[in-house]
Amino acid sequence: MPKEIILPEGTPPPLAPYVPATKADNIVYVSGILPLDENNDVVHVGDAAAQTRHVLETIKHILSNAGGSLKDVTFNHIFLRDWADYPAINQVYAEYFPEERPARYCVQVGLVKPDALIEIASVAHV
């Protein structure tokens, strides 16, 4: 099965040996996306809602480069630093997935960047 590497312009360079996304058999696998700028610095420090919006906009951009959109997302893996941010994250998440929401799970973890409050990995069928 051939796979296509998705490397959209404007996304921060990976922090380790991985790519932002791969596409195989019309399925796009988006790596865990952190709220980072083009220099890999965390944006919107302390603001879970703004970080969530930034992450979802980055995923939207990646999917667009793969020929898809957020409507094609079938599963999201959500990692958050603090459960206290869960309501703010859900409020923004609901704006991006108002109907036909994808399956998901959400777990509390330590994230690779200390100021990051959220990370999302996605799977989409395009």
UniProtKB/Swiss-Prot annotation:
GO terms for cellular component: cytosol. Keywords: Hydrolase. The gene is rutC. It comes from the Bacteria. It holds the Pfam family Ribonuc_L-PSP. Transmembrane segments: none annotated. Belongs to the RutC family. This is 3-aminoacrylate deaminase RutC. It comes from Acinetobacter baylyi (strain ATCC 33305 / BD413 / ADP1). Involved in pyrimidine catabolism. Catalyzes the deamination of 3-aminoacrylate to malonic semialdehyde, a reaction that can also occur spontaneously. RutC may facilitate the reaction and modulate the metabolic fitness, rather than catalyzing essential functions.
